[in-house]
């Protein structure tokens, strides 16, 4: 086997009809882990239903449908391999909760693949003021997805077909837009493709012989290797807590930063409960240590299930332990709110695995969302499209960290009226020391 490939996550973004599913489906179909039998079954069904256009989106639609019906589709189906990487596709957008998932999502994307519809009218709709292309790109940048690949899709349907002039026009316009968002377009490959016909997806296309850059597959291989934050202090937000007969209390979650290992004394923020880790498991195998990205269960001593909740954060008691936030200041971008947001607004914040109402105590400044420059001090309100620095106060104890120190615990979605109305990143936190926190006997013994 040789050295195992590096795992990376990509998020596929773009306007609703840009061909995201077809393109993603194509990659997964050609390079991925979809079982041949499953493909054959789909192809047979497609033929019976006269779905001549079977191609690739259909694979994805089937997978989505099965996933939404609660048939657990092996998540491996959303993976594919390049020469260098194992790629996982994070919840392809179009999904209503996409924005929320992208923020609180199980993993930070290492690269965004922006799909553009190159056809006449299609491109214009996607990039227009209210098109999703802009919003998705802004979101990706704000949330720290610094690498991007741009695919000019549907080149088989431009006028004339595979038109270089059309490609050049799109590259020019999208570049100027991405520059405004904060990306450096010179570092972004613009790959002309057809997700449907397969041009330049994996093999170089003779239809596009005027193009000399990388294919989509080559561009994915050229992504800079992500640095994993295993050298930072431990942060492990809890997703669930189980009581397992004969073992005891087992919190479950994903290591975001640092490492967790048996024998470590952990402190759970925001309560300060401190205890010893007896064992760490992943996929029913005991681990000597778990690293960032690992989804693990770990057994803790002398702790009742009721003392731990989803949204609590496990940390190393001897290395910057997690604490609750008395208040914090965040840069917030309002994306989807019908009215005005003023002081006293109290929506729900989704940050890592916690879901807690937070009060906008004070809107400190309105800022230019691209440059970060201050536009106005203490504005009366913020509305759609505005960005501001806001002082927030959680209504219940919760752990947040600055985006600079612990990115996955420093980005959040603001939810109201069952939708994401804003996104934000935490700039600084006023932490409070827990009072009367329980330290178990096991932890006390360890501490001696």
Swiss-Prot record:
GO molecular function, one term: translation elongation factor activity
SUPFAM superfamilies from the UniProt entry: EF-Tu/eEF-1alpha/eIF2-gamma C-terminal domain, P-loop containing nucleoside triphosphate hydrolases, Translation proteins
5-glutamyl glycerylphosphorylethanolamine, modified sites: 289, 362
Start and end residues of each tr-type G domain: 5-230
Modified-residue entries (N6-methyllysine), positions: 261
GO biological process, one term: translation
Renumbered residue ranges of the record's region G2: 70-74
Keyword Magnesium on entry: no
Region feature G4, mapped onto this chain: 153-156
Residue span of region G5: 194-196
Residues that hold GTP according to the record: 14-21, 91-95, 153-156
PANTHER family xref list: TRANSLATION FACTOR (PTHR23115)
The protein's role, per its UniProt record: This protein promotes the GTP-dependent binding of aminoacyl-tRNA to the A-site of ribosomes during protein biosynthesis.
Protein name: Elongation factor 1-alpha
Source organism of this protein record: Solanum lycopersicum
């Amino acid at each position: 086997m040789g050295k195992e490939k590096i795992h990376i996550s990509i998020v596929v973004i773009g306007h609703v009809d840009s061909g995201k599913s077809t393109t993603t489906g194509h990659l997964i179909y050609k390079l991925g882990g979809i079982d041949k039998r499953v493909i054959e079954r789909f192809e047979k069904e497609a033929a019976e239903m006269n779905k001549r256009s079977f191609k690739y989106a259909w694979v994805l639609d089937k997978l989505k449908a099965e996933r939404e019906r609660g048939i657990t589709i092996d998540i491996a189906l959303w993976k594919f391999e390049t020469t260098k990487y194992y790629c996982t596709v994070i919840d392809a957008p179009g999904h209503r909760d996409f924005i929320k998932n992208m923020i609180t999502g199980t993993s930070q994307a290492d690269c965004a693949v922006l799909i553009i519809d190159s056809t006449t009218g299609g491109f214009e709709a996607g990039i227009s003021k209210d098109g999703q292309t802009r919003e998705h790109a802004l979101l990706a940048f704000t949330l720290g997805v610094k690498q991007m690949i741009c695919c000019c899709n549907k080149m088989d349907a431009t006028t004339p077909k595979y038109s270089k002039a059309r490609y050049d026009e799109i590259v020019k316009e999208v570049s100027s837009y991405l520059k405004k968002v904060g990306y450096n377009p010179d570092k972004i490959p613009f790959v002309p493709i057809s997700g449907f016909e397969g041009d330049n997806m994996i093999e170089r296309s003779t239809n596009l012989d005027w193009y000399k850059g990388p294919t989509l597959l080559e561009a994915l291989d050229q992504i800079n290797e992500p640095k994993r934050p295993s050298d930072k202090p431990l942060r492990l937000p809890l997703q669930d807590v189980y009581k397992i007969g004969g073992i005891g209390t087992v919190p479950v979650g994903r290591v975001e930063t640092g490492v967790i290992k048996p024998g470590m004394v952990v402190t759970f923020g925001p309560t300060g409960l401190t205890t010893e880790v007896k064992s760490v498991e992943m996929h029913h195998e005991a681990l000597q240590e778990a690293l960032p990205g690992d989804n693990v269960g770990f057994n803790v001593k002398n702790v009742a299930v009721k003392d731990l909740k989803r949204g609590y954060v496990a940390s190393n008691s001897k290395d910057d332990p997690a604490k609750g936030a008395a208040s914090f200041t965040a840069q917030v971008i309002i994306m989807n709110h019908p009215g005005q947001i003023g002081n006293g607004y109290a929506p729900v914040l989704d940050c890592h695995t916690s879901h807690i109402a937070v009060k906008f105590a004070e809107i400190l400044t309105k800022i230019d969302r691209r440059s970060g420059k201050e536009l106005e001090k203490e504005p009366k309100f913020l509305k759609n499209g505005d960005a501001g620095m806001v002082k927030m106060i959680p209504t219940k104890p919760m752990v947040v960290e600055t985006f600079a120190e612990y990115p996955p615990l420093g980005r959040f979605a603001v939810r109201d009226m069952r939708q994401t109305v804003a996104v934000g990143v935490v700039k600084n936190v006023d932490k409070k020391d827990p009072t009367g926190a329980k330290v178990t006997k096991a932890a006390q013994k360890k501490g001696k």
